[in-house]
């Protein structure tokens, strides 16, 4: 217990003794310049004051840089901001107490400099090849150790002598390369403090530019709208910039003629001209330096005339023509005229022309100039690039020069021109004189003067000897004058030619002669050859053109008889007349030798160059006429001959076309007659070279051949369509009508009149080319009239049907029952009468109608004489009897108003076949038949134009026969069955005529192509068909026995036939024809007996 008390008291006394103890935390301090640091002062015991004192002993107060803060009664804090070297030293913390006194504590503040890089810029750039020094300045309070590292390694260990660390710790790289480029680390170390710091420095190695021209020399041609590209290739680091200079002057981007690519390595010059020729520099520049390359642009130029001059001088003077030209290479200059070239070294012997050449210039000197030197001179400059030519005009003024024939021939009464051709510049005034008297004058009324630009003609019409003689032509201009005498001489007929040789053949003679010695002053126009048979007085003559025979001086007389003696003589003909004849020479033609002589060939190449006209001149025919010529030809380089051609003997030439260009050809012609062939006549020629195609200089709107042919075809097709449509609507015929009937079910053209028409006529052809008349009376009944369906006729409907045995009655009833068949002085025309309106005919009846004019012996125009018919042919009056001059005044049954009206036919009188007048009063009114005249062509007429109908009926062509001969011929009769079996009438012949209108009681309807024969008109008293065929109108003739027929009787027949076709007017010659079959023998026999 005692011990515890002692311990407590001991501790108490110890604590009282150390109550003002001062402790500074941290007890020491080191700080780098610029850094901040604080110290904490702790006091043990109760202190009334705690203060801080600087190393200099000054009490520190609370300041901006040094802060003193008393935290509580026991602690105080000293803070030093941004220390500097002056702040180093011992700082003291003092604690004081009133009872205890003072107590202090100290701390030593050490200040040092931290390792820093004072100057180490990055990047650092160097030029390749130089000694580079990499700068790195290090700052520290105590020395530091500096090392350099590159790519993670110390450069010292590279063992590269180029790397050296200098004394100032800089790194030197000798001859730095582009491969040395990169990051270098500068590292500092302080061993005492273990401090380390580093700095990475980027090293850039710049490479100087290198530049090279792709082409050192570039060639171009000026004025050819060319473009040229100049280019350079540059290299370096960094990439160099390129610029261009021309003759040391910068070329700016944006000039009109120049453009650059993106990096300016290429420069394009447009529309190169000679002025663009120069040295161009391309310069590459970067931080390492610059480089330059030279490009030479050589511009060649076509020659161009720079100077020419037109000149004028006087005859006999001297002048020099100068021509200058530019171009590269230097052009050579030559001279030429329109007719020849003048060389640069040319110098005539007399010194008339001298040519001297200089660089880019040439001079042409003309001495003693003549008027013929005037004209156009061409200066031609040429070099390898091209040629330029320019004309200059050289004008020579000279005195008049008179040209023309001095002697002129004519004769009295023949006007002649004396022409004075005047050459002068300037133009001259021309005057005419006769015996010193100016013409024209009142004393010379037969003289006229005609003036032209370069001539003056004096027309003299001599009427006496005084008009012949001298005439003077005088011409004057500003340079001088000249006159000339012209002599007008009276011409004479030529002298006789001289026969040198006479070479006879079988039918020709060849006369070789010499031209007359004297032409009489005027040209020989013709030669006259005269010949006669020896012993006869009559001379035969023929004229030959002097131009044709003068070339070879040979005349060939043709048309002679073989083995005959002849006399021949020649004479010449000029403008005045026929000259003297040569003495007659005898010769004898040779016997017939058979084959002809080879013809003579003359070729005329055509303008197109690849065709030729070969004239074939007939020679001796060998005594028999030449039948034809055999023509063969081929190209000489070809083996085969072209197909042989036969040319008629009356042809005088043959044309060979579409030959090859620029090829040699040979032609062989052989004449052939009945006796054989002649020898070969040969002709060789060469075609011209194929012309080059030229392009039209102006726009042409002409059409090609194909377009023209196409237009013509389309026009023709459209025309056919228009005609076909017109025929369809007007005449109910044509292709459209055929399609409508056969495919569309349209009624045929005869459907309109089937209920109105009471008789139809169809016109067909048989082998005898005679028309067949079918007549159906309204009393007849056919299978189509029994109320059943009627069959419309069409193009395929047969014309005839097999004859029904039960039908034995005559199918034709005349208006006068006593007569059914009438025979007249006419041709026989066979027509078929349909027994049903719209069905094929079942029987045929042959009637005879007149195609000849009626005889002139008719007693009256309205009288019909009754003639008894006999079984034999009726007596035929003369066919040449003229028609009567008067016409009956009766109403016409047939309207032929569309036919030609000239020479209208009169009423038929004195008909050979007449109606029986006694039957007219007793017979009932006959059924009305619808009749249409057939448009026929007489056998003896000229070729008529084709009719509009598609089916043309052919008329039998027969020669003119006398009535006497025709009456002696027996009648030809065919049975009805034979007529039925006759198949010569083809389907085309049985087609109905369309478009023909009938008027019945004012109604109009169409009928097929069916016509009644002319003899039906004769039977009914109308005009003969011959009158219709010749364009003459027909009129109805009364069928009664009275000599006069009242008009009312004719008017009872209301049927009027309108004929649409207009037969061409022709001269008809009657040809008696044969009578053909009648339907049954009983009717035929009765008719014949009545005629008898």
Swiss-Prot record:
Coiled coil (residue ranges): none
- Return the Low complexity bias intervals: 820-832, 839-851, 917-929
The entry's heparin-binding residues are: 149-153, 158-162
Q: Which GO terms describe its molecular function?
A: axon guidance receptor activity
> What Pfam families does the entry give?
fn3, I-set, Ig_3
Q: Where in the cell is it found?
A: Cell membrane
Q: Where is the Fibronectin type-III domain?
A: 493-592, 595-691
> Where is it predominantly found?
membrane
Composition bias (Polar residues) maps to 860-871, 968-978, 1080-1092
Which GO cellular component terms, listed alphabetically, does the Swiss-Prot or TrEMBL entry include? axon; neuronal cell body; plasma membrane
Ig-like C2-type domain location is 20-108, 113-202, 208-295, 303-397, 400-489
Q: What membrane topology is annotated for this entry?
A: Single-pass type I membrane protein
**Membrane-spanning ranges:** 706-723
The known PTMs are summarized as: Polysialylated by ST8SIA2 and ST8SIA4. Polysialylation modulates cell interactions by confering both attractive and repulsive properties that are highly regulated by ST8SIA2 and ST8SIA4. Polysialylation is formed on a-2,3-linked sialic acid of core glycans.
Stretches assigned to the Cytoplasmic side? 724-1092
- What are the boundaries of the signal sequence? 1-19
Q: Region labeled Disordered — which residues?
A: 754-1005, 1024-1092
Highest rank taxon of the organism: Eukaryota
Assigned keywords, A-Z: Cell adhesion, Cell membrane, Disulfide bond, Glycoprotein, Immunoglobulin domain, Membrane, Repeat, Signal, Transmembrane, Transmembrane helix
Listed as disulfide-bonded, the cysteine pairs are 41-93, 136-186, 232-282, 323-379, 420-473
What biological-process terms (Gene Ontology) are attached? homophilic cell adhesion via plasma membrane adhesion molecules; synapse organization
Parts of the chain on the Extracellular side:
20-705
Compositional bias of type Basic and acidic residues: which residue ranges? 754-784, 1050-1068
Q: What does this protein do?
A: This protein is a cell adhesion molecule involved in neuron-neuron adhesion, neurite fasciculation, outgrowth of neurites, etc.
Q: What is this protein called?
A: Neural cell adhesion molecule 1-B
Lineage of the native species? Eukaryota, Metazoa, Chordata, Craniata, Vertebrata
Q: Which gene encodes it?
A: ncam1-b
